[in-house]
């Protein structure tokens, strides 16, 4: 059964490159990014894991923990990490799950029904501190994930979780936001002291509230 936005992220206990981890316990009160790759020693995923390791500080300042998953065994992960560190000039600094029994892949619907049952699709799940799924993305094998976009989405999710706003197309942190349609004009004046710019009754902008 496919997971939907707002569903509780399935918990699991997994063997990882950083030891055995209970996923929900490991997350604690943090946000989480869980992303899968189809197999170790694949070229696109090699660049992706390297990219994530280089921006770990960006995830940390947003209170986000990152974990990767594939169905390959732990020894394979460890050998692949050496290649990633060498070719991407990085040091892998987050856990990679060895999901040999496909427990995680099945729980998160990462096995494409028309694909080899060994391969996971390249999915991304963003999970809130409440353990609810906030976003899902699935990429084709030929297209590397854009982690700048994933950080941008996290910024939007965290902002809109604490303020009655939405973020418009191509929004980036610090830019104007949209006042939620459920907020009346009088309430908006109280909630957003930086001011309101009303374009249409349903389209009202306000400077980004402070997090």
Language model segments and positions:
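Chalcogenol-based redox active-site neighborhoods
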Residues: 1-211
């Amino acid at each position: 059964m496919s997971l939907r936005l707002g569903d509780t992220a399935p918990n699991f206990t997994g063997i990882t490159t950083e030891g055995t981890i209970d996923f929900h316990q490991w997350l604690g009160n943090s946000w989480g990014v869980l992303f899968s790759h189809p197999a170790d020693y694949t070229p696109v995923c090699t660049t992706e894991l390297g990219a994530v390791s280089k921006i770990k500080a960006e995830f940390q300042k947003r209170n986000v923990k990152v974990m990767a998953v594939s169905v390959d065994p732990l020894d394979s992960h460890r050998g692949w990490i050496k290649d990633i560190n060498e070719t991407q000039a990085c040091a892998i600094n987050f856990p990679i799950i060895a999901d040999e029994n496909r427990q995680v892949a099945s729980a998160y619907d990462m096995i494409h029904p028309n694909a080899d049952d060994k391969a996971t699709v390249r999915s991304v799940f963003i999970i809130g501190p409440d353990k609810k799924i906030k976003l899902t993305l699935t990429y084709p094998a030929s297209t590397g994930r854009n982690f700048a976009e994933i950080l941008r989405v996290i910024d939007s999710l965290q902002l809109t979780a604490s303020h009655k706003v939405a973020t418009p197309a191509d929004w980036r942190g610090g830019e104007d936001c949209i006042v939620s349609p459920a907020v009346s004009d009088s309430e908006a004046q109280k909630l957003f002291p930086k001011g309101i710019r009303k374009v249409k009754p349903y389209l009202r902008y306000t400077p980004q509230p402070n997090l």
